[in-house]
Amino acid sequence: MNEAVSPGALSTLFTDARTHNGWRETPVSDETLREIYALMKWGPTSANCSPARIVFIRTAEGKERLRPALSSGNLQKTLTAPVTAIVAWDSEFYERLPQLFPHGDARSWFTSSPQLAEETAFRNSSMQAAYLIVACRALGLDTGPMSGFDRQHVDDAFFAGSTLKSNLLINIGYGDSSKLFARLPRLSFEEACGLL
């Protein structure tokens, strides 16, 4: 049986963690980005399909390629973030299933149903984006996930000629707490959950 993590860890991962819009000028190393992936890759996905593909944008040149795709409200916080991750999904993720799920012919589940393949890739890459956020928090980083961007522009600018399609963006760095908004409420258990 697994042991519960400490209250301090729960605070870091969930209750005290915030979505950041402003950033300190502290760089995030490539080694730290590798550590993030080394943690997030263990999060569960359907048939271990692991459809997420991540581009970590760290350079001014990369940010300029991204700039035209950003909504006005997301522009400044993205350009000043040390790293912006494009979380994409591979529309042909199933080609890796003989490696990732060798227990049966899982590839055929998806080659026979393009709709199932797309739904699976999008849903599971979204789950993997959440794992990335938790991994960042576990390593002492802050994040700012965003869906306010032009997906087609991102796909054309970064994934043209490939099987990748963008899902969401996540700014990563060390947040400037002086730029946080007041914490917003969440739904109560009674409002969001049911017991049968």
From Swiss-Prot:
Give the GO biological process terms. nitrogen utilization; uracil catabolic process
- Reply yes or no: does the keyword NADP apply: yes
The prosthetic group or cofactor this protein requires is:
FMN
EC assignment: 1.1.1.298
Reactions catalysed according to its record: 3-hydroxypropanoate + NADP(+) = 3-oxopropanoate + NADPH + H(+)
Classification via InterPro entries: Nitroreductase, Nitroreductase-like, Nitroreductase_HadB/RutE, RutE-like
User: Which EC class does it fall in?
Assistant: oxidoreductase
The family classification in the record reads: Belongs to the nitroreductase family. HadB/RutE subfamily.
Sum up the protein's function in the record's words: May reduce toxic product malonic semialdehyde to 3-hydroxypropionic acid, which is excreted.
Q: State the protein's name.
A: Probable malonic semialdehyde reductase RutE
Q: Which organism is it from?
A: Escherichia coli O8 (strain IAI1)
